[in-house]
Amino acid sequence: MQNSTLYPSVYVLGNGQLGRMLRYAGAPLDIHVQPLEFNAPVFDLPKDAIITAEIERWEKTPLTELLGHHKNFVNQNVFGLLADRFTQKSLLDELNLSTSPWCLLKDKTQWPEVFKNVGEKVVVKRRTGGYDGRGQWIITENNQCDITDDLFGEVIAEKFIPFDYEVSIIGARFKNGEKRFYPVTHNLQQNGILRYSVTDISFPQQQSQQMQAESMLGKIMDKLEYVGVMAMECFVVGDKLLINELAPRVHNSGHWTQLGCAISQFELHLRALLDLPTPSLQPIAPSVMVNLIGTEHNSQWLNTPFSQLHWYGKEV
């Protein structure tokens, strides 16, 4: 693809499905987006190039060392901050935003204090990694020995929350502080993996949840002086949202925006990075995203009306 003459090129750390979708979103606007494998060869970066990432953490290679510390890497310091659950939860506490009670688990002598102050039942999570249900343990006094000595200092303990359901919101912040938000999306997880996302602005509690979510995510993005798309996952407990996870990037719960909104989350991220004019985000219709995992490709899916198929052959 020939580089754009209208806008600076955007280089993406990571060449997975999110990087590919960013590249597709840039094409109609003549924005050259180049996803990069971590082990790709080093090259001379154009002076006006913009760097972003499709993932919070990356392996150390000559290319990631060059781009990951480059002055043109937007939100450079945010990725490491939010990739670590300890610093992420500390940020939420600093901003006085609702999240599950938690603590850093340093050694086994803490267990009595944890069960007293955090909860009788806790979820122990690795500080980094451990997504899609991996690197997480449900712990009570009866199975605390499941957390081995090598994990202490590398995990946090959160109170187990018997939530009603899960939602997420995706928003973007521009350089001047303006923000745009998609409607709150309802998510169904199975074994810690997102399987369905449903968006419908007529859902009960949608308006109150939207106000809460926009306020919380907006406060976070302002504090970080963030530019681009960020996702926030929440537990719903009664009429209250508890923040579960933040992702400083485009997010799988926002895939519905590719067909359900005039501006997808991928295009929105590029618009924010390049500081392009952007109207309010209006959904076209109620939308559903189904995450096809561990299933064979079926060409009959293409017969489904008013749908798009995105097949990227990701292994389970």
PLM regions and their residue ranges:
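ATP-binding N-terminal substructure of ATP-dependent carboxylate-amine bond-forming enzymes
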Residues: M1-S90, T109
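Peripheral (often C-terminal) accessory segments that flank ATP-dependent C-N-forming ligase machineries
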Residues: L6, E94, R271-V316
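Glycine-rich nucleotide phosphate-binding loop and flanking beta-alpha elements
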Residues: G19, W58-E59, G130, F163-D164, ...
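Active-site nucleotide/adenylate-binding loops and adjacent lid/helix of ATP-dependent enzymes
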Residues: A83-I220
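Short acidic-glycine loop/turn motifs at beta-strand connectors
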Residues: R173-E178, V236-K240, I293
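Active-site "cap" helix and flanking loop/linker of ATP-utilizing ligase/carboxylase catalytic domains
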Residues: M211-M232, P248-T295
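A short beta-strand motif that forms the metal-chelation/ATP-contact edge
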Residues: K240-V250
